[in-house]
């Protein structure tokens, strides 16, 4: 059992028969009345966030979670399949538990968060920066870059992002998965 004085960002606990992670919290001690803690909680299973207030000293059941690196294998009707990098065990997760799946490519690394006591996979965490090949975009025309600007591009994972006009099909680009924005061109397509 933990109480509100133990709250910290990333802490996971059981509340209202569900698993929640603390995204943000603030201890408040008003001049009149009892102290309380304002929190932003994220549901571990489906990802939706709620704001909740706890009285100071309220007790919650803390749950220990572990992050382990896995390799993304493929997606089919049963879900997304992953392999543990150390034991080579494979398992699948439903798509709604896989955050950032539009940036996963087969063979790519991803961290999976497990509930330590039951070994149940809870969610995935994709790397903050990933390199993906541009599979479809309009060709850049000489002189287009004078004014700057962006154009849509489809990546090998199926995601669509805005890229600068000089990016062509076959280029490998680095993007930030948190902001879902282009960062830089890693390599240009070969024109052989």
From Swiss-Prot:
Cell location: Cytoplasm
Gene Ontology, cellular component aspect: cytoplasm
A molecular function GO annotation: translation elongation factor activity
Pfam families membership: EFP (PF01132), EFP_N (PF08207), Elong-fact-P_C (PF09285)
GO BP annotations, alphabetical order: peptide biosynthetic process
Functional note: Involved in peptide bond synthesis. Stimulates efficient translation and peptide-bond synthesis on native or reconstituted 70S ribosomes in vitro. Probably functions indirectly by altering the affinity of the ribosome for aminoacyl-tRNA, thus increasing their reactivity as acceptors for peptidyl transferase.
UniProt-listed PANTHER family: ELONGATION FACTOR P, ELONGATION FACTOR P (EF-P) FAMILY PROTEIN
Protein's name according to its UniProt entry: Elongation factor P
Organism: Salinibacter ruber (strain DSM 13855 / M31)
Lineage: Bacteria, Pseudomonadati, Rhodothermota, Rhodothermia, Rhodothermales
Name of the encoding gene: efp
